[in-house]
Amino acid sequence: MTASAKPSSRHHRIRSLEVTGGFLQGIKMDFSDGLNCVIGGRGTGKTTVLEALRFALDRMPSETVDRRRHEALEKLLQANLGTGSVKLELETADGILYSVSRAFGETPLVTNADGKPVDIRIGNDMHFGVDIYSQNQIEDIANSDYFQQSHLKAWSDE
């Protein structure tokens, strides 16, 4: 990894996801600049991949807003990650590369291209924003005027 790469687009992107340990042991997925879809049969780890992304980026549902969903996802991650970890490679719109690593029960560790820890926050208020939707969430949005309007408002405020 170099200190900076030529930006391939004018937006931030997730370059790859790698899992060490657990159900997805050894998986490495490279992502394209645009829309990425995870497709596979029942029980192949699609939900686990999606939730691993959400977990590494510290974008889990709020425990105070949706406690039941938060706890269900924590159980899923603990069962599927075990003592393993998730690592993401991120590229900013300016072509700067970062890695984010996270194990269950820990906070995300962000490092620069040289592997040195940097003081960048991951999560809802970080400059590297991301929207991640499960199939059920997409169905909820499609079936609810309220969800559609709230998402459109949130996107228009950006």
Cite the ranges covered by each PLM segment.
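Charged catalytic cores and adjacent phosphate/nucleic-acid-binding surfaces used
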Residues: 1-43
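Active-site-proximal structural scaffolding
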Residues: 10, 31, 42, 46, ...
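Generic beta-strand/beta-sheet core signal
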Residues: 20, 32, 38-41, 52, ...
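Active-site-adjacent structural elements in folded domains
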Residues: 22-24, 70-73
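Short helix/loop capping segments that flank catalytic or ligand/cofactor-binding pockets
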Residues: 26-27, 39-40, 46-48, 98-99, ...
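Phosphate-binding glycine-rich loops of NTP-binding sites
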Residues: 35-71
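Nucleotide-state sensing region of NTPase/ATPase domains
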Residues: 76-132
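Extended, charged alpha-helical "arm/stalk" segments used for dimerization and assembly
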Residues: 116-158
